[in-house]
């Protein structure tokens, strides 16, 4: 460090020491140490007075003596710490004083700058050598500035080192906080161990009791009469099944009867509708093939009756008149065309086919369909009846 100061010109040494914070922080540190020392000393005095008052006053006995013995080292440590704080404050003050001395011994940077400016001017104007003595004197002054700064820095270094060497480290308190923490940890560990030891049998008993509970539940479930319960349920369902079967049959019968009733009602309605027409035809004589029912267009056929078996029938009956001769003028009971029976309706009778020679072979379908429950069916005669003319 001395070598560094020696090799540095005054421009650097002077600029460093004057550009720093100065001795203010050192004096502030010294004041803080002094305050700490005063607080420690006051605490030690107060603690000692309290312990002494308790031991000499109402608190007496072995506990009082033990407490006083335990507090004595702490009081001593407080007093020692207060002394060390006072020493640190003194050393900080000494360091600040050394700095002030070094600062005062160091050449001011302005003087160094002036010397360098003067040297430059003398060299610039030294045309004939007239400034040589002045230049030498200026250089000598500069060397002295160099030496002065180095001496100041060396002295400051020596003073700061002496201050640092006289400082002693603070002693640790007599109360071992780590020991207390370890002791508390050991106590907590012991408590946890004891609690675990106390709870282990309970937990083991609970775990061991679980299989027994499961086995008991399984045995109870196995003992339940599940099959018997199912059989009882099936037996309880038998009456319902027995009742549902006849009810379904009755429902089907009702449906069939409804269909038959509708068909009968339809047949009865048709017959009832034809009764007035039939009666009117009888009264007027047109329903039996009279002149009023046939019209003027059928006058050529009035004398030609149709034969159904051994019975003569009017030519207006459906089935006895050829399809080509049918006319809308034929009004009457026999002129109604045969209807195709609907599904589920009364069964009508188809018109019987014509026999050989053009003779009719059966009853009209309209008459056969209105015959009621027991219609009279006229069987066809398998013979050829000759046609007999009128007049």
UniProtKB/Swiss-Prot annotation:
InterPro entries: PPE_C, PPE_dom, PPE_sf. GO terms for biological process: response to host immune response; symbiont-mediated suppression of host antigen processing and presentation. This is Uncharacterized PPE family protein PPE38. PANTHER family: GLUTAMINE-RICH PROTEIN 2. Belongs to the mycobacterial PPE family.
């Amino acid at each position: 460090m001395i070598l560094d100061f020696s090799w540095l010109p005054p421009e650097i040494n002077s600029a460093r020491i004057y550009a720093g914070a100065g001795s203010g922080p050192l004096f502030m540190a010294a004041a803080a140490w002094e305050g700490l020392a005063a607080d420690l000393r006051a605490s030690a005095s107060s603690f000692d007075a309290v312990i002494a008052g308790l031991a000499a006053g109402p608190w007496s006995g072995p506990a009082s003596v033990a407490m006083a013995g335990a507090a004595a080292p702490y009081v001593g440590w407080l007093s020692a710490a207060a002394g060390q704080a006072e020493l640190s404050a003194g050393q900080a003050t000494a360091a600040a004083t050394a700095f002030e001395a070094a600062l005062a011994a160091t050449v001011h940077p302005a003087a160094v700058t002036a010397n360098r400016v003067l040297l430059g001017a003398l060299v610039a104007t030294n045309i004939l050598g007239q400034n040589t003595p002045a230049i030498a004197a200026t250089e000598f002054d500069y060397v002295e500035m160099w030496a002065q700064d180095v001496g100041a820095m060396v002295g400051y270094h020596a003073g700061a080192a002496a201050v640092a060497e006289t400082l002693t480290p603070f002693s640790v308190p007599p109360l071992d906080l780590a020991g207390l923490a370890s002791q508390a940890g050991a106590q907590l560990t012991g408590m946890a161990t004891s609690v675990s030891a106390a709870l282990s049998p309970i937990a083991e008993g609970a775990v061991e009791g679980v299989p027994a509970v499961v086995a008991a539940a399984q045995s109870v479930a196995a003992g339940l009469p599940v099959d018997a319960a199912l059989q009882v349920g099936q037996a309880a369902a038998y009456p319902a099944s027995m009742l549902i079967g006849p009810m379904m049959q009755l429902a089907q019968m009702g449906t069939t009867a409804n269909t038959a009733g509708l068909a009968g009602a339809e047949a009865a309605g048709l017959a009832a509708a034809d009764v007035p027409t039939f009666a009117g035809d009888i009264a007027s004589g047109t329903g039996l093939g009279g002149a009023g029912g046939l019209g003027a267009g059928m006058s050529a056929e009035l004398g030609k009756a149709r034969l159904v078996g051994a019975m003569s029938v009017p030519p207006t009956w459906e089935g006895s008149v050829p399809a080509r001769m049918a006319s809308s003028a034929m009004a009457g009971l026999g002129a109604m065309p045969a209807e195709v029976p609907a599904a589920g309706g009364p069964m009508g009778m188809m018109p019987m086919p014509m026999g050989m020679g053009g003779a009719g072979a059966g009853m009209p379908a309209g008459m056969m369909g209105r015959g009621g429950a027991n219609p009279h069916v006229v069987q066809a005669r398998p013979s050829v009846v000759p046609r007999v003319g009128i007049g």
